Amino acid sequence: MRECLIARLTFTEYTQKSTIEIACGDTDAGKELLDTIIDVSRENSIYRGHNLHLSYESGKKDEYGDVEKPERFQITFSTIEDVTDEDIVLTEEHLTVLQRNIIDLYTRRDILEENGVPARRGVLLHGPPGTGKTFACRFLCHKLQGVTCMFVTGSSLLNVGAIFSFARLLQPAVLFLEDVDLIFATREINLYSTALGDLLDQMDGLRARENISVVLTTNAIDRLEAAIKDRPGRISQCIYMGAPAPAQRRLFLAHQLRDHDAAAVDIEQLVRDSDGATQAFLKEW
């Protein structure tokens, strides 16, 4: 590498941001060094391969336009409960679709690349509250060991650009964007049109060789912007998750009772009595 000088590495406490400045007479050499620093930080990041929760707090300016409160993008390690193969209460159809559209993209990446298949997908999980959408996301995290899984929800979805930039830095990665209808509603009722446009641009901007998938969840698919859910290049599979069938209820109830003395419990009667109940209802039953 040609001669370069790292002029300054600073961290600003107020904004919680780091800055690298490089002074060099040769622009290409400076860029080469900067790229090397980014690559090393990417490969050695403490966040790589873990389950993360991303949160964003918007900034605030005073009446004179000065920053009163800086925007903050925070990253914490997620403590979601692991879901193993023994815990699965999804249907075979759901498992097959998740395997084909998400898991195989990471476990069979080399084969897909050899055959020119893009290793990125968008999947939308939709259905009433409490029907297992978050459970399915946790299952994917369990199956994708070594993949960076990032959970984003609520107002944090407003900072789409930073979310996707972080995913690119730590790929292979899966972005779990939860309750997306709250921010990315149809244009007629959307109060966050800028964020909606950013999401569409980011999903369209994923390159074929970028190993990033996006899993969206919503309780109200009718509210969700059509440009997200109806565009194959953005969403490759919409998966409806309704109230569990008898077989899934039986398995779910058995799991809930496995650490208790349930010898006197009639599981089959519980299955019959719980027709139409969601997993969330069964858990509190």
Question: What does each of the following model-derived ranges do?
Answer:
Residues 124, 274-285:
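The conserved phosphate-sensing helix
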Residues 29-37, 163, 252, 285:
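Hydrophobic side chains in well-ordered alpha-helices
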Residues 84-270:
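Walker A/P-loop NTP-binding motif of AAA+ ATPase domains
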Residues 1-109, 120, 155:
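AAA+ P-loop ATPase mechanoenzymes
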Residues 27, 31, 222, 246-247, ...:
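Loop/helix-junction capping segments adjacent to catalytic residues or to phosphate/diphosphate-binding pockets
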